[in-house]
Amino acid sequence: MMKSRAWGWVLGGVLACLPVALTGAERFGDIEISLETMPVSQPRRGYQTLIARMANRDTKKKHGVRLVLQGPEHGVIALREVSRQVEVGAGAQMSMLLPVPLGLPSTFQSCAVEVDGYQEGELSIVLNLGAMRSGVHGAALSSPEFLVSQRVSRDALRVAVGTSRSGFSRSGPAMVGSLGQPAVLSLAERTIEAWPGRWSAYSAYDVVVITDLEWRTAPESVRDALWRHAECGAVLAVIGDSFVPPVACRTLEQSPAVGNATAGLVRFTIYEAGLGRCAVFGGSGPTISRRGMSRIINHSQRSLQEVWERVSSASNAHSLAPVLKKVRTPLGLSFIVLAIFALVAGPINLMVLRRKNRGIWLFWITPVLGLATSLMVIASVLFGEGLKPLARIEGMTILDERAGRATTIGINGFYCPLRPRKGLAYSYDTEVTACLVDTYGMGTKASPRELVWDEQQHLRKEWVAPRVPQYFRLRTSELRKERLGLLRDGSQLAVVNGLGVTIERLVLVDFDGTVYEVTDIPEGDQVSVGGPAALVLPRLSAMSDVILRREQWKTDERDNLPSSGLLRPGTYLAYLEGAPFVPNGLQRSAKTTEASVVFGILREEAQP
C-alpha cells in the first residue's frame, strides 16, 4: 500500500515510496523507471498526467533524475518541451507526477531520461495533446469524459450513461470509451490507493466515478484531490449509500427510490460542491439511475465545457479582461527621426563634405548616421510605451472558511514590450490554460514554448510574445487562512477584514438571514455593520451558473452579484481592491491592474 502524504505539503508533487518491486521498468544506470499515463481520450483542456515510478538500486548514493518530453522540431507544434527533475534517495522507491497541458497542437513520442546530468536513454511514449481550440461560442459540445475506478460496474455504468456496448473499448492497458457516445468512459489502470494526490491530475476529466467503499479506503490525499476537483467545476459520482460529503453541501436534487423488487430500487442525490457537483447513487439493486446520470452529464456540458470552449481563444479572453485597450506605439516620433536622418545623411552631409573636400568620408559617415538613427528609432519605440510589462488580474473566489479552502476562477492578461526573461510562474495547484491566437503556432517551425516543473510550474520561452497581448485562464484550489471575522456584542455585529487587502464593498448575510452592507474596510480593521440593508435576496442560484456560465464577476456585471441568487444565510460577497487569491504569473515584475470578488462561506463560530 502507498504511504499517503498531503499533496499540499509537497510542492514537487512526489508521491510516497512504494515498497514493492517495479513491474515493466527499464533500467538507466542505477535507476529503474516505469512510465504510465492516466488515460485521456479527448485532449481538450487541463493536464494529462504521466506517472513515473522510480527505484534507486544504489543503496549508498542518491541520484538526480530528470525526465524530458521533447516534441519534433517542425510541424504544427505549440509546445516543444516538458520536463521535471527529482532526487531519488539511496535505495529508495518513489513516484513522480509529470503533468502535460492539453488542448495544444503538440505530439511527444519519447521521454528522455537524464541521471545526474547525463542522458542515459529514452522511454517510449506517445502523447497527442490535441488540436488548436476554436474558441467559437455555440460550437457542438464534445462528450463528457469519465474516469471510472476499477470497482465500478462497467455494465451498470454503460446502461446508466446510455452508451452502446462499445461504450468501453480496449485501448492498450486502459478501457477507453468510443467517441460519439453520450459520454467517453476511461477505466483507471490502478486501484484508487495508487491514484495521484493532486486535484490537477484529474483536470482533464469531467466526471470521476468511484464506489463508496473506495472512498473510505482511499488515502486522504486522494479524497482531498477528488473533492477539490469537484469544487473546481467537475463531478464526483459515488456509487453507494454510505458516502457522506466531507463538508456540508446544499442538496440540489434528491430522487425517491424507484424500481421493483426484482430489479432492485435505485435512487440518487445531487449535491452542490463548489462550482461542481457530487452525485451519490444508491439503491438495493446493481443498476444506476439513468436520470441522475443525465443530470451530471448536462452539468458537465453546460457549466464546464461550454465555458472553456467559449473563452479559449485570445480574442474572447481580451473581451473579458482587456489588458491593453490601445497600443501606444510612437509612430510620429519614429517618422520624425527618419526624416531628420534623410535630411542629415543626404543633402547636409554631402554639402559639408564637399566644402571640406572630404567626399570619401561619405562611406563611413553614412553608416554611422544610419546606426545612430536605428538606435534612436528603437529607443523611441521602447521608451515611448515603457519597458515595464502590464498585467490585468481578475477573478472570483469561493472561500469556504469551514474547510479553509479557496477555489478560484480567474484570468491573467499580459502585455510585455520585451519577452519576460524568467517566463511565467504558477503554483502546482493552478491549472493554466493558454488562450492562443487561432493561427499562432501554425506553420513549418515548432514553437519553442517549454514547461518546466521545479519548485513551481514555469512557462518559459514564447508563452508571452513581445508586444502582443496574451491571456491565460486559471483554475486553482488551495488551502488559505484568510477569512472574514465576525464579532457579536449583544445585538451589535462587527466584521474584521482578514482577507489581506482592502474590501471596497461587503454584502453580508448573517445566519438568521439579515442582510448588511458595508463599504471601505481597510485590511485588518474592525468595522460595525450598522443596520440591516434593504436588499431582498432572490431565489437561490447554483454557484456554477453564476460564476461559470454567466461569469457575473466580470467588470461590467459584478455590481449585480448580490441579486444573482448567490447569497444565502451564512455567506458574504466581498469586492476586493486587489486580487490576493488569483495567481499572477509575472508576480511583482509588472504594472498590475487587479480586481476580484470573494464569495465567502462562514463558519458558525466565526471569530477574528
Placement of each model-derived feature along the sequence:
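Short acidic, flexible loop segments centered on an aromatic residue
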Residues: 60-75, 505-514
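A glycine-centered loop/beta-turn motif at secondary-structure junctions
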Residues: 204-205, 234-235, 257-347
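Accessory, solvent-exposed terminal regions and/or long lumenal/extracellular loops of proteins
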Residues: 327, 406-608
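Aromatic-Pro/Gly-enriched surface loop or interdomain linker
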Residues: 102-207, 211
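Internal/C-terminal transmembrane anchor helices
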Residues: 360-383
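Short alpha-beta junction capping motif
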Residues: 202-246, 272-281
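Alpha-helical transmembrane signal-anchor/signal-peptide segments
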Residues: 381-403
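Intrinsically disordered, low-complexity Pro/Gly/Ser/Thr-rich segments with frequent PxxP/GP/PP motifs
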Residues: 71-106, 513-543
